[in-house]
Swiss-Prot record:
Signal peptide segment: 1-24
Keyword Signal part of the UniProt annotation: yes
GO molecular function terms noted in the UniProt entry: hormone activity
One cellular component (GO) term of this entry: extracellular space
Source species taxonomy: Eukaryota, Metazoa, Chordata, Craniata, Vertebrata
Gene3D superfamilies: 1.20.1250.10
UniProt keyword annotations, A-Z: Disulfide bond, Hormone, Secreted, Signal
InterPro entries documented for this protein: 4_helix_cytokine-like_core, Somatotropin/Prolactin, Somatotropin_CS
Family the UniProt entry places it in: Belongs to the somatotropin/prolactin family.
Oxidoreductase is among the record's keywords: no
Subcellular location: Secreted
Disulfide bonding pattern of the chain: C70-C184, C201-C209
Protein's recorded name: Prolactin
Length: 209
């Protein structure tokens, strides 16, 4: 998996270098690359969730906060594909970027907490949270390039603030809150992935997106 992610970053770096050197990089190519990165981001968050599931307290999911408690829950996003199809490209891209940037601090918290997590696979979990950070940063750079290419949305969207400074004092609370935060990220990464794939389809002018 690490080799695949490394290859993705190298490909994106090549595209960004071409763009910075004045070489024309097509919108379709940029959206294709961004879609591949967002897909890997969501796949990695799913893999992390599966790792946590192997040793998760039986009452953990009952005690876990509801999805409405995610710090990004207040950001208004399309509920389904039909709604998303009616959103202008620049606004949909701005939504994806706002969602992604809202996770800068939470991903940093997850990475710092992972090594001491009360879980037998905390080493693997730590490695994957670092991968999440790297992938998120790569995708963020790609989205900045796309916004420059497509144009800014008339509805300027800012990242949502994250108020959580720690995951709790006891080991079970920390594990449950870690899982909850990751589940929120997994949900948002799925939205980002769907938005970018829809933009890729629309840019290709396909009849059915």
């Amino acid at each position: 998996m690490a080799q695949r992610f490394k290859g993705s970053n190298l490909f994106l770096t090549a595209l960004l270098c071409l763009a910075s050197q004045g070489h024309a990089v097509g919108l379709g190519d940029m959206l294709e690359r961004a879609s591949q990165l967002s897909d890997k981001l969501h796949s990695l968050s799913t893999s992390l969730t599966n790792d946590l599931d192997t040793h998760f307290p039986p009452m953990g999911k009952i005690l876990m906060p509801r999805p409405s408690m995610c710090h990004t829950a207040s950001l208004q996003t399309p509920h389904d594909k039909d709604q998303a199809l009616r959103v202008p490209e620049s606004e949909l891209l701005s939504l994806a970027r706002a969602l992604l940037l809202s996770w800068n601090d939470p991903l940093l918290l997850l990475t710092s907490e992972a090594p001491t997590l009360s879980h037998p696979q905390n080493g693997v979990i730590y490695s994957k949270t670092r991968e999440l950070q790297d992938q998120s940063n790569s995708l963020s750079s790609g989205l900045d390039r796309l916004i420059h290419k497509i144009g800014s949305s008339s509805k300027s969207l800012s990242p949502l603030p994250f108020q959580g400074g720690d995951l709790g004092s006891d080991k079970n609370s920390r594990l449950i809150n870690f899982y909850f935060l990751l589940s929120c990220f997994r949900r948002d990464s799925h939205k980002i992935d769907n938005f970018l794939k829809l933009l890729r389809c629309r840019a290709a002018k396909q009849d059915r997106c």
